[in-house]
C-alpha cells in the first residue's frame, strides 16, 4: 500500500500551534509485508537511520502490530526546516500501514496537530486538541495565492526552537496575536484584503530570530519583493512569503537575490497550496502521482466561475480526530 501526504507550513505568524496550510511538496510511503524489517529512504532525509528508530518504521510498526515490514520512503520535503516533514511522513506511514485514523496517529506520533491536520486534510486548517482528541476545521483559502519558501541549509529542530520561547506571555501580546490571526484568516480567504500586518506576531518569531539571525532581513526582502505578507514557516528556519500567483516568480527571484546578498546558502521554492491532503493507493495504480500541475493557475487568477470570479476553496468543514468529515 502506498500513501502520499503534503508538506505544510504551520503558525503562519500569529496562528501559533493552531493554523497550517498544506503545500504541494510531498512524502510518499510504501509498506509491504516482509520476513524482517527493511527501511529504505530516497530523496530528502535519505541519510537518516534506516532502522526501527526511523519515524516511518515506528509509525508503521505501531499501526501494523509487527516489524515484519518493508518500508520505502520517497520524500521531497526538506527535514528540520519547519515544513512539516515529520507530520507528512507520519501521516503517510500510518495510512500505508493500514491505520483507520491516520490523523490521530500522525498527531500522536509527530506531536504537532496543526501540521498533521494539514497533511491529512489539505488546504488551510485550524487544529486544536479537545479532550485528548484532535479537532480540525478546514478554512476557506483563496486558491490564487502561492507561497515562496526560503529554505536555508540550516537544520533547526522544533524542540530547540521551542526552548527559545518564554514560559509566559502578557495579556497585551496575547490580544495582539488574536487580532492579527483574525486578519490573517480573512486575508487568506480573500487575498484582496490580505494585509502585511496580518502575519505579525509577538509569541514566537522574534524569540526565534537569534537562532537564524538573517531571518528579519530576509522577511523584509520578501515583502519588498512583492509578497503580500511574510512570516516564519513553522518553527523555522524556513521563511514563507504569501503571494498572488502572478507575483510568485518575481518574489522567488527576489528571495534568491536576498539569500545571495546575505550569504545564506539554500534554496527558494515556489509552491502552491495542496488541496487534497492524504492520498492512499491500494491498487498500485500508475497514476498515483497525479498530474503535478499546481492547483493555482499560471496567471494567478485561480479557478474561475461562470461569471469570471475567483473560486475560493470551500471552508467550514469540520473533521473529528479520525480525519473523517
Question: Which residues are covered by each model-predicted region?
Answer:
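Active-site rim beta-loop-alpha module in soluble metabolic enzymes
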Residues: 148-210
Amino acid at each position: 500500500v502506498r500513501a502520499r501526504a503534503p508538506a505544510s507550513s504551520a503558525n503562519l505568524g500569529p496562528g501559533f500551534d493552531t493554523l497550517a496550510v498544506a503545500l504541494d511538496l510531498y512524502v510518499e510511503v510504501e509498506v509491504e509485508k516482509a520476513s524482517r524489517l527493511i527501511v529504505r529512504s530516497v530523496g530528502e532525509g535519505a541519510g537518516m537511520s534506516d532502522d526501527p528508530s526511523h519515524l516511518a518504521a515506528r509509525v508503521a510498526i505501531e499501526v501494523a502490530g509487527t516489524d515484519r515490514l518493508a518500508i520505502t520512503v520517497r520524500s521531497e520535503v526538506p527535514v528540520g526546516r519547519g515544513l512539516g516533514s515529520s507530520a507528512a511522513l507520519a501521516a503517510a506511514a500510518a495510512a500505508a500501514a493500514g491505520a483507520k485514523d491516520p490523523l490521530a496517529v500522525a498527531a500522536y506520533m509527530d506531536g504537532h496537530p496543526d501540521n498533521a491536520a494539514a497533511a491529512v486534510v489539505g488546504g488551510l486548517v485550524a487544529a486544536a486538541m479537545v479532550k485528548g482528541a484532535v479537532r480540525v476545521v478546514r478554512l476557506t483559502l483563496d486558491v490564487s495565492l502561492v507561497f515562496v519558501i526560503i529554505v536555508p541549509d540550516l537544520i533547526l529542530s522544533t524542540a530547540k526552537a521551542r526552548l527559545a520561547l518564554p514560559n509566559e506571555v502578557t495579556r497585551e501580546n496575547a490580544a495582539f496575536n488574536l487580532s492579527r490571526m483574525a486578519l490573517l484568516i480573512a486575508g487568506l480567504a480573500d487575498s484582496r484584503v490580505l494585509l502585511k500586518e496580518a502575519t505579525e506576531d509577538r509569541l514566537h518569531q522574534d524569540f526565534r530570530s537569534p537562532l537564524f539571525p538573517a531571518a528579519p532581513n530576509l522577511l523584509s526582502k520578501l515583502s519588498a519583493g512583492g509578497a503580500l505578507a511574510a512570516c516564519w514557516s513553522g518553527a523555522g528556519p524556513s521563511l514563507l512569503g504569501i503571494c498572488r500567483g502572478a507575483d510568485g516568480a518575481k518574489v522567488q527571484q527576489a528571495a534568491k537575490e536576498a539569500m545571495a546578498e546575505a550569504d545564506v546558502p539554500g534554496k527558494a521554492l515556489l509552491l502552491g497550496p495542496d488541496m487534497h491532503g492524504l492520498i492512499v493507493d491500494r491498487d498500485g495504480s500508475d497514476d498515483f502521482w497525479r498530474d503535478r500541475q499546481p492547483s493555482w493557475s499560471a496567471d494567478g487568477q485561480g479557478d474561475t466561475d461562470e461569471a469570471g470570479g475567483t473560486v475560493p476553496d470551500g471552508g467550514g468543514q469540520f473533521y473529528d480526530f479520525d480525519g473523517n468529515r
